Amino acid sequence: MSIDIKFTINDILFNQESLQKKNKYTCPICFEFIYKKQIYQCKSGHHACKECWEKSLETKKECMTCKSVVNSYNDLSRCLMVERAFDKKECCCIYSFNEQIVEGGTNCSPPDGASDQNQRKLIKDEENGCKEKIEVDQIDSHLINCQYKFVTCSFKGCEKILRMNSLESHQNECGFKLVTCDFCKRDDIKKKELETHYKTCPMVPIDCSQGCSVKIERKSIIDHIENDCCNTQIPCKYFEQGCKVEMKRSELQNHLERVNHQNYMGILIEKLTNQVGQSKKTHDELLKKIEDLSLLVIKFSDACLKKQVLPKALDICSNGYRNKWIISNYSSVAKSKLNCQALSSPMLSILSHLFQVCVYPKGDENKEYISLYLRVNNIEEPNSLKVEYSFTLVNVLDKSKSITKKEDKKVFISSEGWGWGKFLLSDLINKENGWLSNDDKLIIEIYIKILNEEYEPLES
């Protein structure tokens, strides 16, 4: 972020005294240089800045120098030659200075918000400041691109103020720069804290504290000492069986070869044999428990299934079965069917009976109509089934135009189908009439109720 130095043209203009003596490039009223000012003159050639003319003409309609009549700006003319001549005067860059806050007065104007006792002082920086000489009209463009302007470091926490041309080298070494640990790959570590981080980083390789000459990641050092380090003091592997010798891990093999452990091995084998026997017994007991639990799960599942299925079955007995059959891509499917060829719905399992709905897009016998039938597939003669059923052809544009046909009581024998051969003219079934949805689906609502058996009264 760049830091602007507040300045006046007096701070940077060359040959100020000479220019002021000529009285050509200063306003004779406010005595300021005409930097970024518009200069106007009366008919007699007396000039002043626009701001001074405005204040004067508010009270007096006359020239401030010769007292000639000036009614408005229309009586004045712009002094462009003077303005342009001043624009070509040379000055230095404000960034050729260093700015310091000093106590007491100075020949420079205080910045906004600074008191008279706490003012700024510009000190020429011959070594590091900008060396360019520029013309007055180039000041703004030069300051935008000047490589000697003051900037702050962009890294959070760093309050360093430096010149832009040294920013890159500073940021490469800035202690607040975020760097990545080569070991744990954390990428939020300040550069100045990296060495401290290495002292606690769990991934940094460190020397084993037992002098085994192996470097281990800090996080794994305890595991290394307990399980791998050749200098760790460990007991004989037959310690529990009676050999109480302790040695370095690197000496264990030599100890086992040098000392006869046959008696200890016998004790260990006996112990392991007992453990194997106990494990087998525990294994058999667990298998028995698993079998018992499996039986309980089966019984529990059957009970739950009955609780779920029974209410649904009772509802179907009382109110009947309702569902929808949605036939996708009906237009192309219907076109592929020949006369008397049917579309069959998935099987409907209702109270142990299997039903199926059949649609004939081009009719079973009546070629101009769509036909709908209901079939029961698992009735064997001489048995029969009394059924109440209905089909509703849904109009998706206007539900009130949907067509419903109902059979109050039909006796089904074997797998014969019952329904309506002339349900609706086939040519009417399209999207425009509402019988097909926009995605070419035909919707049929199905209602089926199995009627209770009727029994003859008992007589005696």
Curated annotation (Swiss-Prot):
Keyword presence, Zinc: yes
Domain named MATH: residues: 320-448
Alphabetic keyword roster: Coiled coil, Cytoplasm, Developmental protein, Metal-binding, Repeat, Zinc, Zinc-finger
Record-linked SMART domains: MATH (SM00061)
Compartment(s) of residence: Cytoplasm
Pfam families in the cross-refs: MATH (PF00917), Sina_RING (PF21362), zf-TRAF (PF02176)
Inducing stimuli: By cAMP during aggregation.
Coiled-coil ranges per UniProt: 269-294
Zinc finger intervals, RING-type: 27-67
Notes on the domains: The MATH/TRAF domain binds to receptor cytoplasmic domains.
PANTHER family for the chain: RING FINGER PROTEIN DG17-RELATED (PTHR10131:SF65), TNF RECEPTOR ASSOCIATED FACTOR (PTHR10131)
The protein, known as: RING finger protein DG17
The organism of origin for this protein: Dictyostelium discoideum
Gene: zfaA
